Amino acid sequence: MTKTDVQMLKNYIGGQWIEAETSQTEAVYNPATGKIIAEVPLSTKKDVERAVQAAQEAFTTWSKTPVPRRARILFKYQQLLVDKWDELAELVTMENGKSITEAKGEVQRGIECVEFAAGAPTLMMGKQLPDIASGLESGMYRYPIGVIGGITPFNFPMMVPCWMFPLAIACGNTFVLKPSERTPILAARLAELFEEAGLPKGVLNIVNGAHDVVNGLLEHQKVKAISFVGSQPVAEYVYKKGTEHGKRVQALAGAKNHSIVLKDADLDAATKQIIGAAFGSAGERCMAAAVVAVEEEVADDLIQKLVDESNELVIGNGINEEVFLGPVIREEHKERTLQYIQSGIEEGASLIRDGRKDHETNGKGYFVGPTIFDHVTNQMKIWQDEIFAPVLSIVRVSSLAEAIDLSNQSKFANGACLYTDSASSIREFRENIEAGMLGVNIGVPAPMAFFPFSGWKDSFYGDLHANGTDGVEFYTRKKMVTARYM
């Protein structure tokens, strides 16, 4: 790829693509090839100021636009996304690395979020009680809150932005998006299509960059709320700094999801689900299976099945239809993953499938093959830390109660899954596990646009989760009106 093939990205402010107030840029790589595909500006707080000002000006008219009219724009946007499904999926694969099959699934999730947001006339409805007392009635009305800031991660460049700005905008707010500097290309395409659907200028703005943009949004007085998805340390920082400046904040953070396999489980089905959950998207998702707690009686059988299935996975450039496991996002993330693998060995875990030996790991791109450890304990870093890579740790347990207790010792509590044929075990799991997203005989309890999504403990900072009715509550404020008619 020559320099002329590299896309030079701009910011999207007030309906215009404009240069940032800086000459500093960062390279965007195709992680499957290691080649530079774009340069993204490292924008400044001046760029944030311009975007917020544009959003504030647009809010004056957009917030007064009738809700059904806003919904019609969302419906047009949804159809454009459907029409561009394959194109969007290819962009996801190019800048993120996940397989084209998974990318198409991510596009579907994003479209579902827009579909949900298009139901704004219903979502924005208030409530009324006509007879709170003699001659008195009371009602609740919803209103937008103003300019919203969104900070999104690299691992879902389509789905996460689409669960933020379409719903916020449908509720009458305006939006400033800071996409991950590692995957900014898809965000630009989303903005182009929204404009094509008829979105007025300034309602959606994009400011590319890193720390300065994040801090600019967190500190700006006219930004009323921040939605964030990313790592635990940054989520905590965003929450504390945002609330310090008087903002609503929802910050979805890291994870270390446990899958529990009981002796009565269908091991073949469990194996298939765990493989997909652990190694799909190269393990770079907050719902990835990171730890398997398996009852001792079936541990050897399950482990052999996991290794056999892992050996059959096709590793490579995700644009090829037959590929299951693509690269991790960057060279430094690959090196970090290799350090965790070495740490597991040094701390005494049994490395039973070494992804470092897959030939793709030693070629072009940022590949790490499926890696499986046995005899892991909760004292090891590979059990404690979010690795965010195709590394699976197996712990042998004697009972469901022990497995639940083990999972609950993690500081993370995003998700957990149980494989069993027992209704009583399912109930025990549901009532005692400390996590926000639970799966029963499935590997990934994925977020749905119409239900709230997030975790517990250090996996979430805030009060209102993403998606569903929580999302509507987050992006709106309420008025209570009590009236006596004379």
UniProtKB/Swiss-Prot annotation:
One of its GO terms (biological process) is thymine catabolic process. One of its GO terms (molecular function) is methylmalonate-semialdehyde dehydrogenase (acylating, NAD) activity. Its EC number is 1.2.1.27. The keyword Lyase does not apply. Keywords: NAD, Oxidoreductase. InterPro entries: Ald_DH/histidinol_DH, Ald_DH_C, Ald_DH_CS_CYS, Ald_DH_N, Aldehyde_DH_dom, MeMal-semiAld_DH, MSDH_GmP_bac. It is an enzyme of class 1 (oxidoreductase). The keyword NAD applies. It catalyses: 3-oxopropanoate + NAD(+) + CoA + H2O = hydrogencarbonate + acetyl-CoA + NADH + H(+); 2-methyl-3-oxopropanoate + NAD(+) + CoA + H2O = propanoyl-CoA + hydrogencarbonate + NADH + H(+). It comes from the Bacteria. The active site is at C286. NAD(+) binds at F154, K178, E181, R182, S231, E386. Pathway: Polyol metabolism; myo-inositol degradation into acetyl-CoA; acetyl-CoA from myo-inositol: step 7/7. HAMAP family: IolA (MF_01670). Catalyzes the oxidation of malonate semialdehyde (MSA) and methylmalonate semialdehyde (MMSA) into acetyl-CoA and propanoyl-CoA, respectively. Is involved in a myo-inositol catabolic pathway. Bicarbonate, and not CO2, is the end-product of the enzymatic reaction. PANTHER family: MALONATE-SEMIALDEHYDE DEHYDROGENASE. Homotetramer. Belongs to the aldehyde dehydrogenase family. IolA subfamily. This is Malonate-semialdehyde dehydrogenase. It comes from Bacillus pumilus (strain SAFR-032).
